[in-house]
Amino acid sequence: MEVPTLELKKFIRDIPDFPEKGIIFRDITPLLKNPEAFNFAIDQLVNKLKEIEFNTIVAPEARGFIFGGALAYKLGKGLVPVRKPGKLPYKVISEKYSLEYGEAELQMHIDAISQGEKVIIFDDVLATGGTALALKKLVEKAGGEVVSMAFLIELTYLNPRKLLSKENIISLITY
């Protein structure tokens, strides 16, 4: 069964007031559970990314790992995992940032990106743009160049492109 692009929204569950009151959480676990929907989403993202010249996908935990790993495999690229503090075993660089519902920090191994390496940032959801901007800063601290940012879901009502106005942004599903 092939799932049309617009139908992917049927596999995303809205959870009101999570993780706090006033937030609508877009839960992708039904999409992940459905093999046709998950494969279709990956294939659609691959089609959007395959013409871009890059070496590595940088993806934050946890849901970014799921899609980032699948995309890196399908595209024959490397994957750099970005984690919360204290989760990586080697020397790290860090970046603090604001979330839709608070503050956070991300870390990446200091040697994960080479000087001049072309990178695509991938995350499951683009909300305010804060996480994506923090990821870009980490890549640039390491000497890399972000050539594109890709997302499964973009929450356009939060206007994330304002913060990321200079970025090449690719989104599969918008709300």
Swiss-Prot record:
Pfam families: Pribosyltran (PF00156)
CDD domains assigned: PRTases_typeI (cd06223)
Gene3D superfamilies membership: 3.40.50.2020
Pathway: Purine metabolism; AMP biosynthesis via salvage pathway; AMP from adenine: step 1/1
GO molecular function: adenine binding; adenine phosphoribosyltransferase activity; AMP binding
InterPro entries: Ade_phspho_trans (IPR005764), PRibTrfase_dom (IPR000836), PRTase-like (IPR029057), UPRTase/APRTase (IPR050054)
EC number: 2.4.2.7
Keyword rRNA processing: no
Domain of life the protein comes from: Bacteria
Keyword terms, alphabetized: Cytoplasm, Glycosyltransferase, Purine salvage, Transferase
Broad class of the protein's primary localization: cytoplasm
GO-annotated cellular components: cytoplasm
Catalytic activity: AMP + diphosphate = 5-phospho-alpha-D-ribose 1-diphosphate + adenine
Single GO BP term: AMP salvage
Protein localization: Cytoplasm
PANTHER family: ADENINE PHOSPHORIBOSYLTRANSFERASE
HAMAP family the record matches: Aden_phosphoribosyltr
UniProt similarity note: Belongs to the purine/pyrimidine phosphoribosyltransferase family.
Function field: Catalyzes a salvage reaction resulting in the formation of AMP, that is energically less costly than de novo synthesis.
Subunit structure: Homodimer.
Protein name: Adenine phosphoribosyltransferase
